[in-house]
Amino acid sequence: MKQTTRPPAQYIVAPGTRFRLVANEYDKNKYGQCNYASYRTLVRCKQIRSKEELAKHGGRCEEHVEFSKTLENNHKKEVMRCHAENDSKMQRRRFDPWIASNEYISDDDDYLQAAQTVPQRLPDVANDDILDNNSLRYAEYYTDKDILNIKMDLVQKDIDDLIEFKELVTSQAQKEHELLGNDEEEDYPTDMAQRRIFKASTKYSRNDYLTLTTIDPVFHQCCVGPDMDDSLVIVHTMHSILDKIDNFEPIDSEKQCNKPALHLSKFCFDHIILDRSQKMFDVCNACGLTAIGGVDPKCSFHIKSSAIAETTSCPCNRCVQPGEHASPKDEKNSITCYLNSSDDDEPTLGNLSRIESMVSPMQQFSNQSNTLTAPLPRRYQGPPAQVLRPPQMGPPPGINQVPYQPKANRTPPMTSQQLHEQQKLKMQEEEMMSQTCASDFRVRPIDASQFGGGKKKQRLPPRRSPSFGTSPNSYQFHQQSQKKMPSIISTAYNSSPGKMNFQGWKNQSTSSATRPLPQPRFPVHAARSQQPKMIPLEQTQDSIEDDIGPSPMFQGPEPSRRGVPYYKNAYRRTELPSRHAQHSPLTPSTSTSSSQLLAPPKSPQPGTSSQTFRSQASRLPIAPHRAIAAGLNPADVGTRPAYRSQMAGQRPGMTPSAQQGSPQLISPPRQGSMMPVAMNQSPQAVRRQTPVPPYRLMGPQRVTTSYTVVRSGSSSSVAGPSRSSVASGSQHTALDTVQHDPRLANINVRTFLSIGNRDLSTLTQDEIDLLMAGNSPEKGGRKAGAPGAKESSKAAGGAQKGTSAASTSVPEPTKSSESSVDPQSDVSFSNPSPAPEVIEKVAPAAMTITSNKRKIDETLASESTSSEATLIHDTTSSSSAETVSGEPPAKKSSDVSAPVPSPEKEKEKIDRPKTPKSSTKRTTPTPSGRTPRAAAIAANQAISHSKPNVPSASTSSSAASTDQENPLDLLAELSVAAAAEEQQQAIGSTSKNGGSTKKTQRKSPSRSSIGKKRENSEEYEEEL
């Protein structure tokens, strides 16, 4: 930098002092301040340069121009480093790869660090040497205080560097320790080249690479034979001449050699001498067989003989004098026969694979008896080296799948039948071992011999294997099994967990008795047929009993619960009784799932295949809308209904048992359920029963069977049930049949309720189709019937829509005098007679469709008006009977069955105007504000058609006391009285006014707004 361009100093020494600096005043028109501002401190550079120089470098001084170039070079280095991490060709490393991988230090520049990994408590040391932080970089004079501050800053920087280096080394060691403890691949170092090295060396930390394998060689046939080329013929001729000179048997070339050639050669081990390019093999000096070359080449037989000859002077018992040697020709023939006798084992590898050709130092000084009588055992116990071939490709060509057997002590090969029998016996032994779980062969799980060092000391008992005629004794068989052991011993016998033992690499101190059975080279377990084990069932199962049904006790239905699916107890797999748990029929199964809702369970017994295993008491469910329409809880459909609570095994319609005197024990009803009716109580016990408060009615579940005592002469008998009870009981039976009839699965709800007590078993398929279509054969007859039938159909329709206000029931006929009943007399039950057609139409609509809320309201209303209903019934019984049927009471009392009304009376009823009467006395409305007019008229018509004997005055008091038990009977009597009173007032008003009913209706002052609303609602019901 030239002196002329150097700007004036920013600070100058104050006059008269040596160290005091004051601001220098300069010409701001000629000089200007550098525009560079530090990114970290946001402080502007205070260098002063001429404006011409600042304009050349973009308003910056020369120092910050060089600094910007340095930043640019650092950026380029960072880019190069990022590219180098993704490339395998990396340069020399400046730092250790472990330290470089933790993102604290870079291999290229230690100035660049990852900002997110820098320790937070240390200062940012990346910008310590920036020029704008050194305020004394251009000072010519320094005070002592400035020098001390500079030294202190340098010492503090060294301290910070040492602390940071300590933390870096600590974190590097921690990270290395964690990485070495984890085997997950994502925790490897991030450096690419180092990662490949680390990944390649990980296998050496385990024993995975210690596998005894060889490369699959390419097998070729030996070229010695009649098809040799000219060069081989010349070589063969020369060797034949030399063999004749040496008195050796020449090589026969008339037959083709079938032995495989050695690797990278065209000759087998016996003919490798013909290869002029090989240098490894030579001819034995003693016998002329192939031997490994050397100073004195000898075959394996002569190596052993020379070793024995050298130890003749040894006083050891193992060393004996060698026998007399035969001539070289006989010696060669004997050795050739010995070698050829064992060539069938491994024709693929030839004599080179015979480990016996290499003398073993352990067997070098063995005694003469073992040497001469039996060949020496192999050093490597097991099959030859494995071949790296996929198992689905099978063995290489030329390898037969005969199980490997060593040459020592060769026995005649076993036939296929003997092998099959041996394999069969082995399978039977395995089956017996697998089934004897409590035998002596089982080792308890908690045993010291199964863990740690105790497992190594454990010695398994010798397993007796079947021996055939091939082995003379058991010791010889164990010797064979010892020589047939594979190379890699199973971990269940000789190795610790997680490791493998290789017999060829360490001394085996275990005896032959502890070794497992010999395994074939290519196991045939894949051909075994997996037969299931037959375990006798009579050991684990008791006799299966039929599910007769729930016991007579606890017959009340379950309380109604909300939110329970309606198929709760249906389609369950009935649990078979066993010795562990005897499940009660009322106990629900705990293993019910949606996958088990498949079909009704069948009986597992073969003798009960014709009937369903599920008893008649536990029926299958019906659709939810039909159950709700029938007044049932969909969740309790599968359970036994309350109206069928009879003795176990008793069918509906059967006569009770002979034990009439003892009442049946019935559990108290649950809250929300109904008290079951005692079916086997005597009439006297029923008559003397104290009145109980009314229970909540559950639709068609309650059946009240009343018996009428008829006096005939001196004897008294109990008649059958009344027609109202018969109609209701038969209706329940019909509805229960429809619920489980598969032919009526898609029937309409309205048609389902209007069926009544019809016998569906006699209907044909066409009639059922008409019922399902809504065109019943009785529909046309009902339309042209009596007005009572028309009113009953309206009542049924209104009740189905929720507009009917009452659930009517036919009142029970009262009994005769108590004095006429003899308690000791026999009680006979007559067969139920069919009910009239009107009751058929009224009963389904009146008893099955009412809601629970209206039932409670009507029950309360009937209780409040029970006393008034008794008086009204006594005063108006004769007049109502005379008005409806047109016959005097005296004549009516003599008849047992009600006569059919005459056609004149029916016509008169049809012509009668249907306008409501303007009487001031009306029936007391229910709490819901509606009058049960339609239901009352329907009940009145039903009573008039089946009117029993008029009760006498003596029985009116007892009837009034017993009527309190059934609030529906009181409500029906009240409705009959109200209807009869309306008819009497209508007749009186007609005779007074003379047919001017319209004016009377208009001028009637008793018509209120409530009456108008009732009239409008009734007209709306008729329209619907």
Curated annotation (Swiss-Prot):
| Keywords recorded for this protein, A-Z | Cell projection, Cytoplasm, Developmental protein, Nucleus
- Region annotation (Disordered) maps to 447-486, 501-564, 577-617, 645-664, 710-739, 773-1024
Where does this protein have compositionally biased stretches of type Polar residues? Answer: 467-486, 501-514, 528-542, 605-617, 810-832, 873-883, 987-998
| UniProt-annotated location(s) | Nucleus; Cytoplasm; Cell projection, Axon
- Specify the superkingdom: Eukaryota
Give the transmembrane region(s). Answer: none
List the biased-composition ranges (Basic and acidic residues). 903-914
Regions of compositional bias (Low complexity) in chain numbering: 584-600, 710-730, 784-809, 859-870, 916-943, 952-962, 970-986
Report the GO terms under cellular component: axon; cytoplasm; neuron projection; nucleus
Which PANTHER family does this UniProt record tie to the protein? Answer: INO80 COMPLEX SUBUNIT D, PTHR16198
Give the protein's function.
Answer: Nuclear factor that influences the activity of genes involved in vulval development.
Question: What name has this protein been given in UniProt?
Answer: Protein sumv-1
Name of the gene: sumv-1
